[in-house]
Amino acid sequence: MTLRSRFAQVRRVLLAAGASGALTAGLLAGAGVSQAAVMLPCDIYAAAGTPCVAAHSTTRALYAAYNGPLYQVKRASDGATTNINTLAAGGYANAAAQDSFCAGTTCTIIEIFDQSPQHNNLTIGPAGGAGGADVGANAAALPVMAGGNRVYGVDVTPGVGYRDDATSGVATGSAPQGAYMVTSATHVNSGCCFDYGNAETNNRDNGNGHMDAVYFGTLCWFPTCNGSGPWVQADLENGLFGGGNGNNPNNAGDKTTFVTALVKNNGTSTYAIKGGNADSGGLTTWYSGSLPTQGGYIPMHQEGAIILGIGGDNSNGSAGDFFEGVMTAGYPTDAADNSVQANINSVGYAFPSSVTGPIVAGDNGSKCVDNNNGSGTPGNKVQMWDCDGNTAAQNWTVASNGTLQIDGGCMDITGAKTANGTLIEWWTCNGGANQQWQAQNGQLVNPASGKCLDDPGFNTTNGTQLVLWTCNGGSNQQWHLP
């Protein structure tokens, strides 16, 4: 379940209607600071007395004055690296710099810079108790509009993860903390664990209460959960808590395209879980009350590492989209949370209605869906091949009409057949049902047959022709759109 539903409908690109991160007069009262014309999330939290100790984003600045690097990419062709900065102080990422640097090859995000004064940068995670060393995200896999600018998010697929085990200023022991991230309900799975927040410093499961991270996904740790998710939950170690002692029927999940996921914990007695549409409206408090009473959570035993896309022991089977996130010192007020949510709304996160780029295989992140030799000959095979940097043979357009287009034609199911093993080919676009594809839970499904695009036998050898097959959730049926 690792593919966002980019072309299920035409998405309107939302332009920011002006920053709305102004704090209420009540929030500012007694803060001892003057209100800037524009206050971004970490300005808001600082004014409320709970400053950011970590601020990570590949899309935008999270302080009005920040004008440094957001993330670093590494080029596959020669190993060179470059930082991607903001366009201006308090602004959005200079995605054009990435496009230019990575032209003709692929790039990986190898570091996400902390914008806070603590400098808690995230790098690719090492091996842990539950998983081998992680890999970096494909830097071009998650294009998104933010503030009217085309930028990139972090496309977390199984095996991708980031970590900092030697942080500064992050809550330890029973100190209070808040954390939020902006993610998407269109790219989730039930693997453990799409987290952002506080974790163990030795990459091991050290027991109850040693984590304090916000989780988003469809993993129901304490059945029975309300619906099928995805849910915002608190990963407090040895459990994803929807509220209380784990099971919370009031937590109905957050299913909007873009989601603000928030968890805060006073470290000694209470925690809260909130979620909301990152594009409009406020936050819903799914839970606010006692910490779990099973033992080990009252008080908490936080260790102060920071993780993204993985569990505390480096469980790295998760999938998710990450656009921005912060961690605070102290337990933020609801008023501060609400003002941060208003600022997030103003960004206008939106997926482009039609995007072009590689379709990356879920069973091997170095392989892409390829139109053999970029040929426009009907019947040309659609195959697995090494990702080669958006050449004509791999530069697919995910169109709003449900087709996957390349080289002037469409991805086609041979003869409009529905049998397992039917070959996938290039054919002139003709509006046929055998050229329709829908992204569902990480799979590319042909609605007419109800079957999935499949890499036969998990064979990622160059030249393996793709087929139609009964959907089974296997990684050989997972595809990551541009």
Predicted regions and their residues:
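Sequence contexts marking disulfide-bonded cysteines in secreted/extracellular proteins
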Residues: P41-D43, P51-A54, D99-T108, C193, ...
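Short, hydrophobic/proline-enriched secondary-structure or compact coil segments at domain edges
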Residues: A65-D78, Y152-V154, Y180-M181, I273, ...
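Lectin-like carbohydrate-binding module/patch detector with strong preference for beta-trefoil
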Residues: S353-P482
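GGW-centered surface loops in extracellular recognition modules
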Residues: A37-G131, S346-G357, A361, C368
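A motif-centric signal for short, conserved binding hotspots located
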Residues: A139
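Extracellular glycan-associated modules
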Residues: Q35, M39-C52, A76, C107, ...
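Secretory targeting and sorting signals
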Residues: T2-A36
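Short amphipathic beta-strand/extended segments with alternating polar/hydrophobic composition
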Residues: G79-G91, D164-S168, L283-S290, N395-V398, ...
